[in-house]
A protein has these predicted regions:
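N-terminal Rossmann-like dinucleotide-binding module
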Residues: 1-52
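Active-site loop of classical SDR/Rossmann-like NAD(P)-dependent oxidoreductases
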Residues: 14, 37, 290-302, 317-320
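Short, conserved SAM-binding/catalytic segment
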Residues: 45-55, 119-126
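C-terminal helix-rich "cap/oligomerization" subdomain common to oxidoreductases
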Residues: 50, 79-81, 124-129, 240, ...
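A structured beta-alpha segment of the ubiquitous adenosine-cofactor-binding alpha/beta core
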Residues: 59-78
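Beta-strand-loop-alpha-helix segment that lines the small-molecule cofactor/substrate pocket
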Residues: 78-139
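Predominantly a Rossmann-like dinucleotide-binding segment in NAD(P)-dependent oxidoreductases
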Residues: 130-132, 140-219, 223-226, 339
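Contiguous beta-strand/loop segments that form the cofactor/metal-binding neighborhood of enzyme cores
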Residues: 199-275, 301-313, 331-332, 346-349
């Protein structure tokens, strides 16, 4: 089968460092076009392409015949990868779906749960006839370490406790900080939403079915003046089984942590991107497995392309999964705004 013609929508840091290399790495896709806000940024992205010599450029300032709608009108482009600012992305997703293009859109699925629900409803209604697929790019669902840990967890019984700790400092010299839509966020949670959905997705490898979250109480704070509206959160999460755990995340802390620790009836697992440690019921380490660290983006793009070729969506990229990731964080934000008032989860899987 011939490679699928694809366009990259957006030319920011992630498109340069992750999406473009991922598209060029798989034989299942061929890059046909790039769209960006400015022609210069589209040119910058195209200039680093290694295996895509004939890429057409589109932008909002390129004039007649080179707008987003013109890209979507092309028959040789069947799919688009969209990586735009959180508030801007939904309208570009809707336009692509309306045009019958398969979509892989960066997380979060939308700025908030209400907008995400509307987007999913739009997709289901609009694409009944054209069959366009809608997938969300959550690369933490494609990291080998978390996949391995989740598979091992199946043999350990139900979850009894968990502790997620992701602590870091987004200082004002960080290149991601200097993207304007992140510096002055017009969406809930700021960096704690932008990054937080990654960490909720990783936690949800283990928190599913009877172990899915059912309620949360949280406190939130803005510690660093340059990270509005908040940069730190501490949440106690209750599961449907009645078990409880802690979800702790800060992008404004001088503490460093990046681990998902989960206790089960028959043992425990500590998962990190480069290592998984499995212990028995009395705490003895029974296995330590190392992994080469990967962002997971090349894996997720390849999985998406394979799903398009087969005509069967990859469940890991389902919009409903991304909706659950978003709800997990949004309820924490709402609880924090209400001084720790309990919030009920309704969309966990």
């Amino acid at each position: 089968m011939a490679p699928i013609g694809v366009a990259i929508i957006g030319s920011g840091i992630f498109a340069k460092e992750e999406h473009l290399p991922a598209v060029e790495k798989t034989d299942l896709l061929t890059l046909k076009a790039i769209f960006s806000r400015s022609l210069k940024s589209a040119q910058d992205l195209a200039s680093i392409a290694k295996n895509s010599p004939a890429v057409d450029l589109y932008s909002t300032d390129s004039g007649e015949g080179k707008a987003y709608k013109d890209l979507l009108a092309r028959d040789d482009i069947a799919a688009v990868i969209i990586a735009l600012p959180i508030n801007s992305q939904p309208e570009y997703i809707e336009a692509a779906l309306t045009a019958g293009k398969h979509v892989l859109a960066e997380k979060p699925i939308a700025p908030d749960v209400a907008a995400a629900k509307k987007l999913i409803e739009f997709w289901k209604k609009t694409t009944k006839d054209n069959g366009a697929g809608f997938a969300i790019a959550e690369n933490f669902r494609f990291m080998p370490a978390f996949d391995y840990a989740a598979e091992k967890a199946k043999d350990l019984g139900r979850v009894t406790h968990f502790n997620v700790r992701v602590l870091t400092l987004m200082d004002d010299t960080n290149r991601f900080f200097h993207t304007s839509w992140r510096t002055k966020p017009e969406f809930q949670g700021g960096f704690c939403l932008d990054g937080g959905v990654h960490f909720s997705a990783a936690a949800r490898h283990f928190l599913r079915g009877p172990d899915a979250p059912s309620a949360v109480q949280a406190f939130t704070a803005q510690v660093q003046p340059h990270l509005p509206p908040l940069d730190s959160l501490h949440a106690i999460v209750q599961l449907q089984s009645g078990a409880q755990g802690v979800f702790q995340h800060s992008c404004g802390s001088t503490l460093k942590a990046f681990e998902w620790a989960v206790a089960f009836e028959k043992g425990s697992i500590v998962a990190e991107p480069k290592k998984v440690t499995i212990s028995g019921p009395t705490g003895e380490v029974v296995e330590t497995k190392d992994f080469t660290r990967t962002s997971g983006v090349s894996e997720e793009v390849a999985a998406w392309a394979e799903a398009l070729q087969k005509g069967v969506a990859d469940k890991r990229q389902a919009p409903e999964e991304a909706l659950a990731d978003l709800e997990f964080m949004e309820k924490i934000f709402r609880s924090g705004e209400q001084n720790g008032a309990a919030q009920k989860y309704e969309l966990q899987l």
